[in-house]
Amino acid sequence: MAYQKVECQFNGQTLTLETGKMARQADGAVVVSFGGTKVLCTAVSAKQMREGQSFFPLTVNYQEKFYAGGKIPGSFFRRERGATERETLVCRLIDRPLRPLFPKGYMFETQIMPTVISVDEQNDPDTLAMVGASAAIAVSDIPFDGPVAAVRVGRVEGNLIANPTIEQRAESDMDIIVSGSRDAIIMVEGETRFISEQEMLDALFFAHEAIQPLIDVQLELVKIAGKEKREFSVPEIDPAVVEKVAELAETRLSEAVKIRTKQDRYAAVAEIKTEILETLAADFEDQEDDISEAFGNLQKRLVRQMVARDKVRIDGRDKNTIRPITCEIGLLPRAHGSALFTRGETQALVAAALGTSKDEQRMDNVQSMEFKKFMLHYNFPPFCVGETSMRLFPGRREIGHGMLAERSIAQVLPNHDDFPYTLRVVSDILESNGSSSMASVCGASLALMDAGVPVSEAVAGIAMGLIKEGDDIVVLSDILGDEDHLGDMDFKVTGTREGITALQMDIKIKGVSKEIMQQALEQAREGRLHILDKMAEAITAPRSDLSPYAPRITTIQVKPDQVRTVIGPGGKNVRGIIEATGCAIDIEDDGRINIASADGDACKAAIKMIRNLTQEAVVGKLYMATVKKIMEFGAFVEIFPGTEGLVHISELAKERVKKVTDILQEGDQVLVKCLDIDRQGKIKLSRKEALGQSLPEEG
């Protein structure tokens, strides 16, 4: 394969696609470069399909090499470990727009591997990996209805920006990744700070316009370096099987799919399917897979026709109606906050825990190292759908759903300086029939308010769907699991009464117009407000106090140059305070000190010890001092821990003193008065001026 290179101008910089130099034995390999960031993207697809394969085994493995940023991994073996949370999330971003563009019936094992091999401090490699992955498939012989491209959209001072730099992202009120083809938006993922539905719509179509040059440059590369696409055959279902299944099952199945409860509906459908398989086994020997596929296709067609044409949903609702909602809080007495959110047959048990800076999660990646102060973890155990399976670790779906909920809630959390807690929220899905991630958002909002976390507003989430049959189009609010599986769009929107905080969208078909998206966003807003009203019946504002089991964090401020004094040599002073009081103490370089303890008295004791270490002498004030060292010319005394001053021999008594030891001995307690503090900070003290006086009583 000859080396080929194409370029385009994007956002004031040059984006480059190269092929034919690296990874030449892959079916497709492209290096995408932008600024100092480079991503090597490879695509390989098996030449033979596994026997009995019934789904498309696509795997995306995105990896950030630490050498790309001139770093060495911090792990014990100094190697990159398994996929980080960030890498897992980027894998999903790449997978979701690519998967629907492979031909129907293509079930050959396919692996996409974007590898970050160089990274600068301004250009995030995630959207570049999305472009490079599409380009690698496009130039390969793998069948593909692409290319697609992706951009990140930010907004600074009201101006939309495509692929903002990391500096610009820090100032932006939105962070959205949009992926699309030449004609349509396919995938959206991101977070915003309370923007309106119209502003969101404008951002989406701004992004679609921005990706066009990235589509063009891929097509240019395909033109000069693309391979001829391989041919493959799709096994077709025997038409006789399709006809017989419809004849035997259509009437009964039409009624079964209208059963409103999920388990009863599934049982009825399974019973019909079993009977059909048994009935047709003799006439269509060894065609069980065809019979099952024909039955599934029939079920899909019946449900879609029922919703799109008859305007009747599986559970009897109209397109706008939200399932019945119940909200309970404070169920778990020892969790710092808890909620049980139930919407129809979807239920989330959500708990919140408050911790200190020691509980922050260290996030070490190729571009930076951060400490995460808010985490939301989503768990989807098999029992929530009445199944069994081995679960050891959260899967990609669970990590993705948890991050969507985390982004949704993060916008309403208090500033860390005002509320210096580390927060962890866990959502355990107890029942699932669609929209479990949105139930997690609602439950998390309730649990945090129950915990007394001063969130600015409640947050709710809703999943929207779309079914398009010819000219019949229906946008559905609060979709069921079957409506998600059998529909054409999954559009999750979260937000407050003020605006949108996060969204996630996957579109499976072409031709979803701006008007349809506008309708979906408006319908989602109406649904979100309804859900917020239901949540307000349980709690309207954060509790005024934290759980008695939560740590109390008190923040005090000392001068930055006093931090060393508080810490002490080798950490001696701060360790002593921790051992004496049992408090957790976190000291910032700017002099901010957080003291955490569930015991209020212990916290007060720690504060007093720190104040003793950092207090400064005041001219004219009396101190009870300890004699530390006797000299011929006077005595050095400690007026408080770490601070000493000199009592000159002439200041020991009103009469003349010949020897210091006539008045003082080392270890004596003596009342002194501060006379002066010179420019070097030396403290001049007097015993003579303190005679006849006493310390004021502590109030």
Curated annotation (Swiss-Prot):
Every KH domain range: 551-610
Catalytic activities: RNA(n+1) + phosphate = RNA(n) + a ribonucleoside 5'-diphosphate
Cofactors (names): Mg(2+)
GO biological process: mRNA catabolic process; RNA processing
A Pfam family the protein falls into: RNase_PH
Tree of life domain: Bacteria
GO function terms (MF aspect): 3'-5'-RNA exonuclease activity; magnesium ion binding; polyribonucleotide nucleotidyltransferase activity; RNA binding
Domain S1 motif: 620-688
Keyword list, A-Z: Cytoplasm, Magnesium, Metal-binding, Nucleotidyltransferase, RNA-binding, Transferase
Gene3D superfamilies, alphabetized: GHMP Kinase, N-terminal domain, K Homology domain, type 1, Nucleic acid-binding proteins
Role summary: Involved in mRNA degradation. Catalyzes the phosphorolysis of single-stranded polyribonucleotides processively in the 3'- to 5'-direction.
Annotated protein name in UniProt: Polyribonucleotide nucleotidyltransferase
